[in-house]
Amino acid sequence: MAAHVWLAAALLLLVDWLLLRPMLPGIFSLLVPEVPLLRVWVVGLSRWAILGLGVRGVLGVTAGAHGWLAALQPLVAALSLALPGLALFRELAAWGTLREGDSAGLLYWNSRPDAFAISYVAALPAAALWHKLGSLWAPSGNRDAGDMLCRMLGFLGPKKRRLYLVLVLLILSCLGEMAIPFFTGRITDWILQDKTVPSFTRNIWLMSILTIASTALEFASDGIYNITMGHMHGRVHREVFRAVLRQETGFFLKNPAGSITSRVTEDTANVCESISGTLSLLLWYLGRALCLLVFMFWGSPYLTLVTLINLPLLFLLPKKLGKVHQSLAVKVQESLAKSTQVALEALSAMPTVRSFANEEGEAQKFRQKLEEMKTLNKKEALAYVAEVWTTSVSGMLLKVGILYLGGQLVIRGAVSSGNLVSFVLYQLQFTQAVQVLLSLYPSMQKAVGSSEKIFEYLDRTPCSPLSGSLAPSNMKGLVEFQDVSFAYPNQPKVQVLQGLTFTLHPGTVTALVGPNGSGKSTVAALLQNLYQPTGGQLLLDGQCLVQYDHHYLHTQVAAVGQEPLLFGRSFRENIAYGLNRTPTMEEITAVAVESGAHDFISGFPQGYDTEVGETGNQLSGGQRQAVALARALIRKPLLLILDDATSALDAGNQLRVQRLLYESPKRASRTVLLITQQLSLAEQAHHILFLREGSVGEQGTHLQLMKRGGCYRAMVEALAAPAD
């Protein structure tokens, strides 16, 4: 395979030579001589097309781009477009005075063996740099960094158009920044030519105005950009949080709340800030680099090409040495850790060392590790010096080369002294901008790659079925468990419910009792559609529970737990929580009276507008239960689930709840499931289910179960027995 690749590369080289050598006269004879620039571009584009097809064939044979082969495509582009680009800039710089002989001379010069070789030598580092920049945006995992960046910017919606305005202001600001180098060159020419003072003063004022305008445009650009990115931050936070809320209940069992919260808040904020900050710098320095490049070509296309050819050598070689220095620094740290380990082992086992009289042996061992580290330290220091020296010398050589070549152009009258001064200032800023861009690309890739954390939640499909569509206007509230089995997602092998079958009838109170761990609270969770049965069916009015619309179902089914959670809001907001309408104050007060919450709420100075604190921590357990019961009653549910919801209530409020369940006018249309360990509540229930190991062990009324003398009676007697 390697031999075929080298043979194909040699054939491409030969084709390139033949294209430039024997085919030139034929191509030139077919083109209009009055448009010399057209000839150059036709040859360049033809060369690019032919060589590009050849490269595609080579990459196809090798099943993709690997190693140096990946640089073939940018190499072909650099070779093919270099001369047309040079001819175009010469045309622009000469204001249309490029002659036919100039274009022909460029092409025939490039077909000479020495020039042909020089063009390849010059294009190779440029292609390597091109490939390096391209690899920074290579696909990471299953996503492409560019696609992820576009998706992040997609959160801007219509406001994404503001970025075009930002780019325009940015370019104008960068152009304004060019005033100082430009006028510095002009002032240099005036000083050398003894120009009058008014011209000098006028141009100083013009330079100042352009600089101030550039600063104002930069300020406006930054302001619009930051406001736009702030909109993106808020939108991303909202969408991520909404995506989390869509997940099934099992998702929150597998993932700790702290981890989810960190992902929604801190990780999302860090990713958004990192992307917006890095993108801002990237756009700014890219705009500067492009503006500087235009002014450099305008000043001297020849010196600009010299600068571009040397850029790869200026940055790639120090980068390579930097990797060597970094690897040596890692080895030094590893060597230091080993020497530290030797000392730690000796000191922690000092009695053993002394009992074997091996103090000198441990000292020699430690010294050996230090010698190894010393050798690595020397290599690291040399690599660091080489990196710094190479960076300094390569930059200095480029500056000296530009000054030398520019001086030759000044001597020949091709450019003025002022133009050379301006070009040097442009070139210094341009190399700095390119250096910053090269350092920003990895940062940008890392920032965009971190957005995978966000997309992991945004793209996650909930395991629970989608919301159904049933929303009948008349519902009875008949609940049927038919051979229901269930295991929690985080413990799929542990069956909590097994073959559970029972019916809850409208207008009745059914008490569900049993020992801890028998599955009582799981029944309540299934009735709220927080989980779906792993076996059997759960029906509401003859229809599977998952077929009901999500919002409709939870207006008909309400639950109160033993330790209900309230939100850090007012009593009024907590009672009205989740309603799709705004209840009147009379409705809120009425349900608060029913639940026994009205009396203590009225005792607060701000009444129903009093904040209850985070998770209701300013209230007692009984007060939280009373507010939660009011929150359930205001929905006027057909199915009310009380999961030990009165355990913390005082005697008066418990009596109030009993009246609510058994004497309220609404009880005839309400199905109640009462999960409790309180005998006073269970005894009055119309029907009692005794749950044992996930299935119904006994059922009947209180008197029937007591006469039967089974597990229910044993539990009642155990609870009634005095404590020893």
Swiss-Prot record:
Pfam families with a match to the protein in the record: ABC_membrane (PF00664), ABC_tran (PF00005)
Originating organism: Mus musculus
Protein name, UniProt field: Antigen peptide transporter 1
Annotated PANTHER family: ANTIGEN PEPTIDE TRANSPORTER 1, ATP-DEPENDENT PERMEASE MDL1, MITOCHONDRIAL
SUBUNIT field: Heterodimer of TAP1 and TAP2 (TAP1-TAP2). A component of the peptide loading complex (PLC), interacts via TAPBP with MHCI heterodimer; this interaction mediates peptide-MHCI assembly. Interacts with PSMB5 and PSMB8.
Catalytic activity: a peptide antigen(in) + ATP + H2O = a peptide antigen(out) + ADP + phosphate + H(+)
Topological domain spans for side Lumenal: 33-36, 90-109, 184-203, 296-304, 416-419
GO cellular component: centriolar satellite; mitochondrion; phagocytic vesicle membrane; TAP complex
Record's subcellular location: Endoplasmic reticulum membrane
Chief place where the protein resides: endoplasmic reticulum
UniProt: Mg(2+) binding residues: 521
Alphabetized UniProt keyword annotations: Adaptive immunity, ATP-binding, Endoplasmic reticulum, Immunity, Magnesium, Membrane, Metal-binding, Nucleotide-binding, Peptide transport, Protein transport, Translocase, Transmembrane, Transmembrane helix, Transport
Enzyme class of the recorded protein, top EC level: translocase
Gene3D superfamilies for the chain: ABC transporter type 1, transmembrane domain, P-loop containing nucleotide triphosphate hydrolases
Keyword S-adenosyl-L-methionine: no
Ranges where the ABC transporter domain occurs: 479-718
Keyword Endoplasmic reticulum: yes
